[in-house]
Each structure stands twice: as structure tokens, then as C-alpha cells.
């Protein structure tokens, strides 16, 4: 409501928008890989086929998104935490703690993947946990409905 808005909360809204765009970039990479038949979900849906042939431009885009994934991931986590700090943690809406846990979950297992000093088994397990598309879907759904509940 307008009476609760402050200068900090106005900036926090914009930070949340930038975080949303970071998630769009992260999941654009996932979507492109699924469409190209890379990943276990697409192999189950389309055995031995791909929807799109592998054009050079798409490969270049995926290569860029692969190289920058870690940076967009770190930025997304930092922006979400900053957004929460600036807007306030609304624990009365149970969706928000769930979003926070899922975002930190993704960040933690993403960090385990890139940390070279961990044993291979731990890195493989971390990859399997981090690569679950359902976590990203959960973040999106819970964040959306949490914001809907706050706007009422």
C-alpha cells in the first residue's frame, strides 16, 4: 500500500525486477538446452531426436550462457537477498521463506559444483540436485503467489 512505501522499498522493487531478469537469463539457458535435446528430461520426452537442429548461432548463445551461468546465478541470489532486505521479510506469507530456502538451496549446490576441492561424488550429487528444473519452477510459483498475497 502507498502508506508503507519508502524510498528504500521503491529501490527494493527495482532490485526485485533485476533479479527476475537474472532468473530469466538462467532459465533461458535451461529452455534452450531442453529444446536442443540436451538433458535427461528432453531425452525422456524425445528419445533420439531433437526439436531443433544445432545451428551455429544457437550453439554460440548456449556457450555464452554456459560461461556466464555462474555469474548470473550469484547475481540472482545477491539481488533476491537485497530485495528481501529492502522490502522486508514477510514471514506471515509462507511462500517467501520457501522461496528463500529454494534460492539458497540452488546457490549452495551450485557452489559445490564449481568448488574444485570437493570429491567427485559430492560434485556429481550437487549437480543432480542443482539441475532439478522443479526447483526453479517452485521458486517462480512461490514468489509469484507470495507477491499476489502481499498485493491484496
Functional labels for PLM-detected ranges:
Residues 1-152:
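Membrane-embedded alpha-helical bundles that constitute the cytochrome b-like, heme-associated redox core
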Amino acid at each position: 500500500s502507498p502508506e508503507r512505501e519508502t524510498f528504500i522499498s521503491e529501490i527494493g522493487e527495482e532490485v526485485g525486477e533485476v533479479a527476475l531478469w537474472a532468473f530469466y537469463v538462467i532459465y533461458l539457458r535451461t529452455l534452450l538446452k531442453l529444446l536442443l535435446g540436451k538433458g535427461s528430461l528432453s531425452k525422456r520426452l524425445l528419445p533420439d531426436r531433437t526439436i531443433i537442429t544445432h545451428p551455429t548461432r544457437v550453439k554460440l548463445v548456449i556457450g555464452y550462457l554456459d560461461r556466464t551461468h555462474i555469474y548470473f546465478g550469484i547475481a540472482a541470489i545477491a539481488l533476491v537477498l537485497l530485495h528481501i532486505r529492502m522490502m522486508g521479510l514477510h514471514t506471515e506469507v509462507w511462500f517467501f521463506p520457501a522461496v528463500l530456502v529454494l534460492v539458497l538451496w540452488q546457490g549452495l549446490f551450485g557452489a559445490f559444483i564449481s568448488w574444485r576441492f570437493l570429491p567427485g561424488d559430492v560434485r556429481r550429487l550437487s549437480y543432480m540436485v542443482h539441475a532439478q528444473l522443479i526447483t526453479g519452477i517452485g521458486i517462480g510459483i512461490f514468489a509469484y503467489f507470495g507477491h499476489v498475497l502481499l498485493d491484496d
